[in-house]
Amino acid sequence: ASNFTKFYFEDFRETLQKYPAHDKAFSIWQQGITNGVFMPQFHGREHLQYKRWLKVLQAGNKDALYCFDHGTTYSGKGDYSFMEAYDWDHPGDVEEHKKIIAEGLFLFKNVFGFASKSFIAPCYNWDPEIEGVLKSNGVRWLQGLRNQMVPTGSFDHYTILPHYFGEVNQLGLKYNIRNCFLEPSLLPGKDWVDSCLAQI
């Protein structure tokens, strides 16, 4: 109805209800939390750079519109499914990211009953300017790869900030660095097990 000029997010529990055989997923997660099997962490309100996505939809990209109509992702030329939620095209976008993060952390606490103590940015990229809102909402650890990818205003061009496990930044947030990289969906033909073992 808005001709792709406005973005509406959806609670992930509603999304789970729409997928076949996922209607019990959240209750299983709750059992896992109760039994100490896993602990959720904040990854974002959505895993989407929605402004770029809306721009492609507004432009009438047929493939993107087809995917939208069928409720699936679009991995077209350039931007990889628009998944890098905290990347930006204009420095002013960071202020909106802060609001989205604050809202997402509020939702996280309401959904799970506790505040997230850690954060991992979608696609491992974020502007250090968002870290204050993370801290003020209870986050104590920033999880990522060995190198943080800081947005520059151009997709897939980042300033690299190296980090090490246990490093403490100026805000007192600590870095939890993954000791290996496992993203099988990126290269389905790759032997990810051997790759991970080699990295460890």
Label the predicted regions.
Residues 22-43, 58-67, 136, 165-169, ...:
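Acidic (Asp/Glu)-rich catalytic clusters
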Residues 1-3, 40-76:
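Short, solvent-exposed beta-strand-terminating loops
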Residues 37-41, 116-118, 140-141, 173-175:
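Structural preference for beta-strand elements that scaffold enzyme active sites
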Residues 16-24, 52, 117-129, 148-157, ...:
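Acidic-and-aromatic substrate-binding clefts and catalytic sites of carbohydrate-active enzymes
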Residues 95, 102, 106-118, 175-200:
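Catalytic grooves of carbohydrate-active enzymes
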Residues 8-13, 59-89:
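Aromatic- and acidic-residue-enriched carbohydrate-binding clefts of CAZyme catalytic domains
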Residues 1-50, 120-121:
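Active-site beta->alpha N-cap acidic-glycine motif
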